[in-house]
Amino acid sequence: MAYTDTNVTGNREDLKQLATVIAATQAPVCGLLPTRQVNNKRPVVLMDSLASPVATGHIEGTATDTGVDKFAAVGEYTGQAQRLVREWQVTKEQEAHNSAVVADKAGASEKALKELMRDKETVVCGDQGKTADVPGTTAGVTAGLGDITNASNTDFAAAYRTPAASIYSGTKADFDDAAFNAVLASMFGQGGEFLDLHLVAGTGLRSHMVVKFTRTAGAASQIDYNMNGTAVIPYTVEMYDSDFGTVKIINGNPACMPSVDRGYVIDPRYLEWGELYGEGSEEYEGRGVGSKGACDLYGTTLSQGPNGLGKVEFSDEA
């Protein structure tokens, strides 16, 4: 296990590099999000939009010095940082044993870090709204994607909320490529730019898409299996090319998604993680018991415009 940096005075080890590796495999949503440093537990994010196009011509001789406020539509979102902690401990007796499961403080710290990253993924993917912290009384809770993409979320100005049309909320049986394309059409309509998106899909949604998107009316007959003359049967959907852009489809961690049927359509330009401090591990005085410590992180989800995001949330979600 390699640490990127060690602060001897504070006895805190920076585990950012290892955390990045873990995120790529066990926390796919966190792995997608850009991270930026914030210095406030309630950072404010600003968002803006362009005025609707007009085709009105200018009349010769009329003045152009009336002035138009170009920042009247600026909206803001206030995040709420959440600290996540995973404690670890290894007794002297455990360290003395030579077993298949190596019990030492490095292994304990790494295992705690993996658990911490799954906790972070669960928070980011959750449906919870933000909760303001009260020191000594209430833990701060950051908003999850399920709440951020709620069409009626009043934490965002109405113009920047995720449109209802960008959320598929019908039954699972009715979700097909036409329904998914309607979600993408709504997202495209927000900015008019060719989309480059990621769909993080629960296992149930992913399996459903394979059946609905690769077979005729859900029947047993296949549409197109043999590609480039190979005999491989690609029973999967990894890329969806639509009229409005490309969607890369990846599996959500089943332990961290709010439902196996849930899916988030993410444009990383409109979602990020605000970090007060990153993943690290501290070791404490053991007083004869052995080695003990904790891994923690402190940050918040932030969105520069949920209107650029989409969601699949079946009405009969498992």
Task: Label every PLM stretch briefly.
Residues 1-318:
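Flexible, glycine/threonine- and acidic-rich loop/arm segments that mediate assembly and lattice contacts
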